[in-house]
């Protein structure tokens, strides 16, 4: 058993408690290396007094979808600036940040992995053969697009390893675009106001993905990260949006032009 290492720490010293518990776990594994043991120490507060690293801790800045439960987890830490701001930021800002995050996670329920589970979280092939064929063709098209866009930057990558995240980005963005369109329509916005709203949304969407990255890190990311590089997380979904291409006058043959296929809607 692991002794109660936080017994002498103040109750409000959350960092001290976490650090002590982390050290205890590390030392426990070292002591038991090569041995068979059933008690696995863990690192997170729970109602049972134990600790476990499960990604749902409120201090985790993340959100994720669980296909076996068909739900999304949104830890409290992401519900603050810069991910959401109800006081000083615009509707378009919040939609492009936390709204896009929600849309992305919702969309994982019907990506290339999530689609294999039914609404109860059971692995079950509930698809009709024809629907499955069409879906798989869309998966192949996403892989083709991301690999092509990367090749223009001299990057060779296997986009099939990250296609689930790519599909969630594409579908999540389309959910936001559809919602923004309905929102502005319900406000009675004229076309010029609508266009400005979309321009603002697209600008914030690109802004939140800004990144400076070393070439060595690029090579590491494309081999280990299930997410595409952020440049392609931005450009590839946008290149599929008819509204984006119309607003910015993007034509066939431009590098930011792909077919108007956002997985679950096809405007062509």
Please annotate each region the language model reported:
Residues 1-100, 105-268:
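Intrinsically disordered, low-complexity linker/terminal regions across diverse proteins
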């Amino acid at each position: 058993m692991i002794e109660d290492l936080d017994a002498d720490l103040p109750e409000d010293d959350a960092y001290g408690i976490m650090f002590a518990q982390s050290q205890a776990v590390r030392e426990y594994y070292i002591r038991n290396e090569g041995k068979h043991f059933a008690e696995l120490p863990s690192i997170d507060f729970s109602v049972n007094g134990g600790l476990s690293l499960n990604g749902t801790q409120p201090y985790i800045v993340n959100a994720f979808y669980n296909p076996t439960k068909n739900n999304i987890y949104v830890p409290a830490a992401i519900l603050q600036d810069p991910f959401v701001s109800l006081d000083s930021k615009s509707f378009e800002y919040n939609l492009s940040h936390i709204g896009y995050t929600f849309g992305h996670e919702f969309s994982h329920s019907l990506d290339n992995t999530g689609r294999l589970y039914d609404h109860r979280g059971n692995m079950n092939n509930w698809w009709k053969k024809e629907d499955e064929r069409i879906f798989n063709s869309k998966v192949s098209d996403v892989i083709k697009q991301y690999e092509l866009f990367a090749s223009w930057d001299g990057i060779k990558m296997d986009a099939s390893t990250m296609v689930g995240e790519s599909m969630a980005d594409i579908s999540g963005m389309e959910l936001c675009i559809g919602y923004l369109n309905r929102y502005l329509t319900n406000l009675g916005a004229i076309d010029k106001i609508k266009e400005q709203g979309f321009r603002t949304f697209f600008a914030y969407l690109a802004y939140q993905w800004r990144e400076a990255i070393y070439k060595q890190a690029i090579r590491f990311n494309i081999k280990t990260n299930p997410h595409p590089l952020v440049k392609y997380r931005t450009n590839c979904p946008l290149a599929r949006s008819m509204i984006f291409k119309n607003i910015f006058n993007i034509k066939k043959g431009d590098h930011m032009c792909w077919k108007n296929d956002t997985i679950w809607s096809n405007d062509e």
